[in-house]
Amino acid sequence: MQIYGDLRRLWEKAKIKESAKKPEITGLCRLIKGYKIMIKVLFICHGNICRSPMAEFIFKDMVNNRGLGDQFYIASAATSTEEIWNGIGNPVYPPAKRELAKHGISCEGKRAVQLKKSDYDKYDYLIGMEERNRRNMLRILGKDPEKKVSLLLDYADEHGDIADPWYTGNFDITYRDVVRGCEGFLTYLEGKGQIIMN
């Protein structure tokens, strides 16, 4: 996976203006010497059983429905180990799973995993749900020299935190906010010329 990020960074540094005008080259799903370059996104929350898996599967559904699935590698993780026992993560919290299912989205097989320092090099975007997540992400990752760390609603019209439905019980509101953030993130990527919208 690292080769994808390395090649993409080399490509961007080259800044070939003529090529940037060609849609088959502009999109992130380009071929450079036989390597397919994908944008790698990691969504992060406290336990990886509610908000971040909702974001993972909502965003997967969103890009797949737009025919963009092959341009992305998408996953999610936790800043804590509270939902991980003896190395095995808990599945998505049932109310979160039901909320996704209401919208025709499956999260089957997903289990909580913890964010690792090495994820900084593996992923292009590490996206938290609230300011506390960001602080804990930086505690695990260290510094953020490449400005990869952000919050999901940074990409939406209204910024702020996505409330934890574990405490609020409002999984419908969390779903709405995650969709809003994911749509904004996709628009942001399109604006940067990192993807080709079909």
Residue ranges of predicted features:
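Conserved active-site segments centered on acidic
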Residues: R8-K15, I32-K122, T187-N198
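Phosphate-binding/catalytic loops
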Residues: W11, A20, D119, Y125, ...
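Intrinsically disordered, low-complexity proline-rich regions
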Residues: M1-L10, T26
